[in-house]
């Protein structure tokens, strides 16, 4: 579970690690954009939001707004919280559609109770497990974060937090503090047998406990580009599925597959799937 190389959290506090140089990587590295966008898409699937209904979402550790751009593409409204001024500056330069807030999630989320319909977070929560000052207590900061997150969510909604735990002890620390704050839920692990593609998603419920979706398996994986491509241009972050014709067979199949990944009951695909019904008298 631990990273083979040096982890970013060991290089100092996030507001210093994510400087202007790191921020530029997030908008000019095609592989990084692709990975971040796919993880945001998976997190949104696991939120299990109502179909065809815009929701008001919170993005913790929003960075340059890559995950937020995906939320906008899906028709949702969102607010992003991040501790790095450089990352937020890049988001502003990109003219993203969401609102941005500079803040430390370890000090709590400053919104009224019941503000958000859901929350996602990509590669951020593990930063709370490290103390960069003598006064910082990881367990207390995690509890403060989860307690405030529980408060700002509408009852019955979800939070899906993608994270990179360093070891099993760190994962236990995170889940314990989430449970103490009132959440139920569990961990969804995609591609558990793959060293590179393995992803952890902490699915938290702010209401009664419900089912935990299954993680994706290796035979569902897509090939990730192995080379990073840098450019001076900024990539437009519109998803390819936006080009699908609504109600077409491809659109229906993609929607059914998305529902399966969310854990819903879906009828098997047949030769009649997506076929337009004949008019009746």
From Swiss-Prot:
Question: Which processes are annotated in GO (biological process)?
Answer: chromatin organization; positive regulation of rRNA processing; rRNA (guanine-N7)-methylation
* Primary residence: nucleus
Q: Which GO terms describe its cellular component?
A: nucleolus; nucleoplasm; nucleus; perinuclear region of cytoplasm
Task: Describe the reaction catalysed, as an equation.
Answer: a guanosine in 18S rRNA + S-adenosyl-L-methionine = an N(7)-methylguanosine in 18S rRNA + S-adenosyl-L-homocysteine
InterPro entries attached here? Bud23-like (IPR039769), Bud23_C (IPR022238), Methyltransf_11 (IPR013216), SAM-dependent_MTases_sf (IPR029063)
Q: Where is this region: Disordered?
A: 255-281
Phosphoserine PTM sites in chain numbering: 240
Q: Which UniProt keywords apply?
A: Chromatin regulator, Cytoplasm, Methyltransferase, Nucleus, Phosphoprotein, Ribosome biogenesis, rRNA processing, S-adenosyl-L-methionine, Transcription, Transcription regulation, Transferase, Ubl conjugation, Williams-Beuren syndrome
Enzyme class name: transferase
Q: How is it modified post-translationally?
A: May be ubiquitinated and targeted to degradation in response to pro-inflammatory cytokine signaling.
Q: Name one Pfam family in it.
A: Methyltransf_11
Tell what triggers its expression. Answer: Up-regulated in CD8+ T lymphocytes by treatment with anti-CD3 and in B lymphocytes by treatment with CD40 ligand and anti-B cell receptor antibody. In macrophages, no induction following LPS treatment. Down-regulated by a combined treatment with TNF and IFNG (at protein level).
Q: In this UniProt entry, which cysteines form S-S bonds?
A: none
Work out whether the entry's keyword set contains Transcription.
yes
UniProt-listed Enzyme Commission number(s): 2.1.1.-
Tissues in which the protein is found? Widely expressed, with high levels in heart, skeletal muscle and kidney. Detected at high levels in bronchial brushings and in normal lung (at protein level). In fetal lung tissue, expressed in the developing bronchial lumen lining cells (at protein level). Tends to be down-regulated in lungs affected by inflammatory diseases or neoplasia (at protein level). Expressed in immune cells, including B and T lymphocytes and macrophages.
GO molecular function term, any single one: rRNA (guanine) methyltransferase activity
Q: How does it assemble?
A: Heterodimer with TRMT112; this heterodimerization is necessary for the metabolic stability and activity of the catalytic subunit BUD23. Interacts with GRIP1.
- Which disease does the UniProt record connect it to? BUD23 is located in the Williams-Beuren syndrome (WBS) critical region. WBS results from a hemizygous deletion of several genes on chromosome 7q11.23, thought to arise as a consequence of unequal crossing over between highly homologous low-copy repeat sequences flanking the deleted region. Haploinsufficiency of BUD23 may be the cause of certain cardiovascular and musculo-skeletal abnormalities observed in the disease.
In the record, the note on similarity to other proteins reads: Belongs to the class I-like SAM-binding methyltransferase superfamily. BUD23/WBSCR22 family.
Purpose: S-adenosyl-L-methionine-dependent methyltransferase that specifically methylates the N(7) position of a guanine in 18S rRNA. Requires the methyltransferase adapter protein TRM112 for full rRNA methyltransferase activity. Involved in the pre-rRNA processing steps leading to small-subunit rRNA production independently of its RNA-modifying catalytic activity. Important for biogenesis end export of the 40S ribosomal subunit independent on its methyltransferase activity. Locus-specific steroid receptor coactivator.
Name of this chain's protein: 18S rRNA (guanine-N(7))-methyltransferase
Q: Which organism is it from?
A: Homo sapiens
Q: What is the lineage of its organism?
A: Eukaryota, Metazoa, Chordata, Craniata, Vertebrata
């Amino acid at each position: 579970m631990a990273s083979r190389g040096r982890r970013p959290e060991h290089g100092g506090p996030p507001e210093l690690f994510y400087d202007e140089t790191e921020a530029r990587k997030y908008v000019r590295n095609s592989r990084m954009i692709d990975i971040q966008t796919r993880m945001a898409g998976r997190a949104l699937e696991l939120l299990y939001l109502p179909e065809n209904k815009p929701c008001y979402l919170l993005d913790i550790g929003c960075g340059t707004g890559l995950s937020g751009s995906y939320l906008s593409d899906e028709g949702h409204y969102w607010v992003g919280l991040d501790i790095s001024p450089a990352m937020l500056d890049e988001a502003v330069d990109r003219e993203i559609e969401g609102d941005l807030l500079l803040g430390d999630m370890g000090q709590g989320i400053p919104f009224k109770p019941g503000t958000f319909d859901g929350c996602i977070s990509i590669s951020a929560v593990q930063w709370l497990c490290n103390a960069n000052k003598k006064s910082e207590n990881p367990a207390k900061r995690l509890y403060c974060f989860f307690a405030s997150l529980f408060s700002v969510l509408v009852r019955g909604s979800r939070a899906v937090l993608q994270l990179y735990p360093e070891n099993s002890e760190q994962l236990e620390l995170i889940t314990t503090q989430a449970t103490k704050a009132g959440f139920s839920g569990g961990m969804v692990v995609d591609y558990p047998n793959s060293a590179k593609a393995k992803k952890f998603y902490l699915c938290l419920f702010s209401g009664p406990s419900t089912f935990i979706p299954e993680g994706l398996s290796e035979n569902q994986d897509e090939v990730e580009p192995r080379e990073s491509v840098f450019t001076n241009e900024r990539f437009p972050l519109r998803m390819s599925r936006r080009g699908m014709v609504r109600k077409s067979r491809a659109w229906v199949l993609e929607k059914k597959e998305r529902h399966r990944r969310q854990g819903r009951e879906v009828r098997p695909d047949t030769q009649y799937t997506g076929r337009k019904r004949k008019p009746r008298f």
